[in-house]
Amino acid sequence: MSVADIKKGAEQKMQRSLDAFKNDLSKIRTGRAHTGLLDHIQVDYYGSPVPISQVANLTLVDARTIGVQPWEKKMVAVVEKAIRESDLGLNPASHGDVIRVPMPPLTEERRKELTKVVKSEGETAKVAVRNLRRDANEQLKKLVKDKEISEDDERRAGDDVQKLTDKFVAEIDKLVQTKEGEIMTV
């Protein structure tokens, strides 16, 4: 394994950690509506659970309302029940064959709770990135031990890995700050 492979592998893994963190953040509800909020909801479709996006069309009606239009009329009640029973605390209302899902405003207490969750998720993501840095540095040390590269090369590569780590940690911090801003905006 070469130094370039180690750096490239570390960067790819750090990017995956960042993507997973972004995905986790998208599931945290702010006061604003977005269709991604309902992505993880499973609907019972003829006896098997399927994602809501596979049985209905999701649209934004306005900044605080999601419109859900099941493709089959008989699925309206099932989809509405699945949304109501989700852990999001939403109260959907059906109007004919369209379900409107209004986003209730967040209470001050809930906002503070959510910012703590966001910070905690951010810390977890940063720890994952730092662990990847440690793994890359251990691989570099092994190359030195096996006399495949010099200590100077290891130091230079280690500095590059540190720069990557700093870049991803800064990106995570930025995402945390942005999400906190979204949550605290009334």
From Swiss-Prot:
Signal peptide: none annotated. It comes from the Bacteria. One of its GO terms (molecular function) is ribosomal large subunit binding. Keywords: Cytoplasm, Protein biosynthesis. GO terms for cellular component: cytosol. It holds the Pfam family RRF. SUPFAM superfamilies: Ribosome recycling factor, RRF (SSF55194). One of its GO terms (biological process) is cytoplasmic translational termination. The keyword Protein biosynthesis applies. InterPro entries: Ribosome_recyc_fac, Ribosome_recyc_fac_dom, RRF_sf. It is found in: Cytoplasm. Responsible for the release of ribosomes from messenger RNA at the termination of protein biosynthesis. May increase the efficiency of translation by recycling ribosomes from one round of translation to another. Belongs to the RRF family. This is Ribosome-recycling factor. It comes from Paraburkholderia phymatum (strain DSM 17167 / CIP 108236 / LMG 21445 / STM815) (Burkholderia phymatum).
